Amino acid sequence: FNLGSPKGFIFDELYYVDGAQDFLNFGVEVTGANPEFIAHPPLGKWLIAAGIAIFGDNEFGWRFATAVFGTLLILLIARLVHVLFYSPVLTALAAGLMAVDGLLLVHSRTALLDLFLTFFTLLGIYLWSRNRHWWAGFAFGLALGCKWSAIYFLAIIVLITLYRILVTHDIRETPRKIALVVTRYGLLPLTVYTLTWLGWFFSDRGWDRQSSSNPIIALINYHEEILSFHVGLTEKHPYQSHPLGWLVMLRPTSFFYDAPSGCGNAECAREVLAIGTPFLWWIGTIAIFFVVYRWIKSLRSRTTDNAANFVVIGLVAGYLPWFALPDRTMFTFYAIIIQPFLVVAIVYCAKLMLESRLNPLLSQSIVVGVFILIFICFLYFLPLFTGQLITYDQWQNRMWFSSWI
């Protein structure tokens, strides 16, 4: 709805839309007649370019792809929750919680790369859990083609798969099984990832393309520069935030702010604030701690809790790695990769509540009441998720903490 608003670029759309436009025109990103250094793989920008090719070089075209993938992500999580719990009620609850999260809504309305990363990563995990290993490897290759941070999820999946092979298979079968893992989760993702660079291979204008007569060596040279950039990214930004505050939305990222007229008041405001629906994330944070407790308990009792395993995978691969880079410039909107796992944690707790010894009507009322509370919170913050024009007082009332300004 009204995907073309706000007009013009918001936040980092400038970089990714510009890259998508270059892909359509040249196959690579350039600045004038010169190659342009870009710090992320090309697939996400190719997806943005697809929207531009279909709907034109305008705000709707820029954001169409992320809107589609945001919708698909809701369906994917609903499917995953169905597989985990086999409950229509919990499946609907998961879809509902995804749909009323402000961070997902903002990402779905902004031409950034993180939503593509999140979708393909979750798709890879889902396919892996269903033993569709070739397709899972393909999905992880696509995730890497959007952002490198998918590598943490791929690494966790590989480690878990190898562990299962070592403890459950005949020693004579182990070498063959390990070779399959290397092929499916090593060579295949690497091949898919490399194919996302086809525009760079077929052009002589890409960054570092002329650094070697061997295009593979040239691409490796380019990747060394990308790695150096990410490791050394310490430039200060007014909205940067430490990962410790991400789950509770301590310092959300303002994507857009304007103070136009036309709200019927002397002072007006429009903002797109990349913040998760507060009650959803605060409740979800508590749920995550509880799920981790249940996961540790399952380890001690040597039982399998697939839903808890899923949440822990998300924390270990999507959250903890950021703590290893304390000086790097980071933002709360990166937490979109954690959001599906947070939703599953809430659904996990809802399942336990519904199966508890409490009166069924009481337990159902608690679950429904929590969802209604989150939904009301979502509606209250909706103007900040979509950049609607409101009075300055209305905007100020939604700044519950000074760190949100």
Label the predicted regions.
Residues 68, 77-100, 133-135:
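Transmembrane-helix signature of polytopic, membrane-embedded enzymes
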Residues 10, 66, 103-114, 149:
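Short acidic/glycine- and proline-prone juxtamembrane loop motifs at membrane-interface regions
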Residues 2-4, 8, 13-46, 50-53, ...:
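Extracytosolic helix-loop segments that constitute the early lumenal/periplasmic catalytic or substrate-binding loops
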